[in-house]
Amino acid sequence: MPCGCGTSCKCGSGKCCCGSTCNCTTCPSKQSCSCNDGACGSACQCKTSCCCGADCKCSPCPMK
């Protein structure tokens, strides 16, 4: 079951978190992902799949 989008959602540990303590710039997915370099930050984005590049942003980092 996918979570909703908005400021109340975030991705982490491969799961979706919706609540006052959650925050995500994009709609997250329950699927886990990781960047090839294993680094997190602006290079990682969690959607239906993992995308790594300058056009990706996500906070916090998706599951390593």
UniProtKB/Swiss-Prot annotation:
Q: Which GO terms describe its molecular function?
A: metal ion binding
Please list the residues that bind Cu(+) 4.
Answer: 44, 50, 58
Record: residues binding Cu(+) 6? 40, 52, 56, 58
The UniProt annotation places Cu(+) 1 binding at: 3, 5, 18, 22
Which positions bind Cu(+) 2? 5, 9, 24, 27
Positions contributing to Cu(+) 5 binding: 33, 40, 44
Record-listed Cu(+) 3 binding positions = 11, 16, 18, 27
Q: What are the entry keywords?
A: Copper, Metal-binding, Metal-thiolate cluster
Function, in words: The metallothioneins are involved in the cellular sequestration of toxic metal ions and regulation of essential trace elements. This isoform binds exclusively copper.
Q: Which family does it belong to?
A: Belongs to the metallothionein superfamily. Type 2 family.
Record remark on domains: 14 cysteine residues are arranged in C-X-C groups. These are thought to be the metal-binding sites in other metallothioneins.
Query: Can you say what this protein is called?
Result: Copper-specific metallothionein-2
- Annotated organism of origin: Callinectes sapidus (Blue crab)
